[in-house]
Amino acid sequence: MPWIQIKLNATNENAEQIGDMLMEETGALSVTFLDAQDTPVFEPLPGETRLWGDTDILALYDAETDTGVVLAQIKASNMFPADFAHKVEQIEDKDWEREWMDNFHPMKFGERLWICPSWRDIPEPDAVNVMLDPGLAFGTGTHPTTALCLEWLEGLDLTGKTVIDFGCGSGILAIAAIKLGAAKVVGIDIDPQALLASKDNAQRNGVAEQLEVFLPQDQPEGLLADVVVANILAGPLRDLSGIIKGLVKPNGVLAMSGVLDTQAEDVATYYRDELHIDPIIEQQEWCRISGRKQG
């Protein structure tokens, strides 16, 4: 059946309050926040809703809703000026799940690594295949930062190596490292849900025994690895540089992403004292910083 959508605009200071009002007082079935200015947004911290300064709000109602009544309720809330801008439109029903699934295809990284949704055929059965379904919270290979890290891992000889995935999220990098030959991988993340997702995805890929996951405060003392990958954000990469460098064995290698091109040189300066930094690699305004720790 068709739906009715009402589009409003708000600032980040009152967007969540407006969303609550639309759900509780006007009977909206769902409320979605969108960036009105296409500003990049990064993964929020646990429990945080990241909004933009100029936020579009989309409220969805069933087709029988009296939009005049809804607009009167919005006006009566005193959250908008009397002549507030809005747009009402009819949305045709679709098989949203099928449409969502159709958007995801197997992706190849480097010469031999594939990330494949479970509902798709594996293009190269003899290649290194990681089965991972797209989710809402954690990396699945579609973002340039994840792609940069996957390509870096694929280019290494990981046979028998130990690897740390710092900020493991879905576990995509950790699982790829195991499938590429790593003997043992440790995933670290501040979000317990990420640790659960990593273990679940490792189980589905048959590599759960080779993956250990920890919250930062629970990781073993003296933890070191031949290879460390950290796909997080520029701020934590700066703030935690001492910790991250301390995880890399002498002559070990480190790769970091989640860094915009305007941030890369600054982040790299935090690591040059202990690592020889490679040329910075850029993809769609995102960068990968890698290097080898001095022996």
UniProtKB/Swiss-Prot annotation:
According to the UniProt record, which cysteines are disulfide-bonded?
none
Q: Which Pfam families match?
A: PrmA
Q: Name one GO biological process term.
A: methylation
- Mainly localized where? cytoplasm
Task: Look up the record and report any one GO term of the cellular component aspect.
Answer: cytosol
Methyltransferase as UniProt keyword: yes
Which EC number(s) does the record attach to this protein? 2.1.1.-
Q: Which InterPro entries match?
A: Ribosomal_L11_MeTrfase_PrmA, Ribosomal_PrmA_MeTrfase, SAM-dependent_MTases_sf
Q: Which family does it belong to?
A: Belongs to the methyltransferase superfamily. PrmA family.
Protein known as: Ribosomal protein L11 methyltransferase
* Source organism per UniProt: Vibrio atlanticus (strain LGP32)
